[in-house]
């Protein structure tokens, strides 16, 4: 598998991608995320929460946590119109070398259900991913919550 953007994934599936920024700002790294990003609890993170759309309908919610010192001006970007991944590469020279992720099914809590326009406790596909730069440095911790009724994962497996 290779790392692809939400927009590329949606286009491959025949959807028109869209994005709404729900929130953006600086936060102190909680201990669990700090451990994943190999930083100290309390270090500054950029937190960007986006609603991802497919043909104008909610598909997922993404919570990106980026180590602020590697992308200090990233909050100035317009991530409703421009891909975060492209800004990281263009403005900070950050390209993803690899990522590690955990995938699980979870019931939608009320707040996510409202945002995704689904009944509470509906099935969500939850992905937690740590993405590493070409220097093998963890830069981003990403939580994605996909609607279980609209999204399926496809993998090709080899012996």
Describe each region flagged by the PLM.
Residues 1-15:
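Short linear motifs at protein or domain termini
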Residues 4, 16-159:
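C-terminal all-alpha effector/ligand-binding and dimerization domain
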């Amino acid at each position: 598998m290779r790392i692809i953007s939400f927009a590329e994934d949606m286009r491959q599936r025949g959807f028109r991608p869209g994005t709404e920024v729900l929130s953006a700002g600086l936060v102190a790294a909680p201990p669990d995320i700090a451990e994943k990003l190999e930083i100290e609890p309390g270090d500054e993170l950029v937190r960007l929460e986006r609603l991802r759309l497919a043909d104008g309908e909610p598909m997922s919610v993404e919570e990106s946590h980026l180590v602020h010192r590697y992308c200090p001006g990233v909050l100035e970007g317009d991530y409703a119109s421009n891909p975060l991944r492209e800004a990281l590469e263009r403005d900070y020279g950050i390209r993803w070398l690899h990522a590690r992720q955990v995938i699980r099914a979870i019931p939608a809590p009320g707040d996510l259900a409202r945002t995704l326009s689904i009944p509470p406790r509906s099935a969500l596909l939850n992905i937690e991913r740590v993405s590493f730069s070409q220097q093998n440095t963890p830069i981003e911790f990403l939580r994605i919550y996909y609607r279980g009724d609209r999204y399926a994962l496809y993998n090709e497996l080899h012996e």
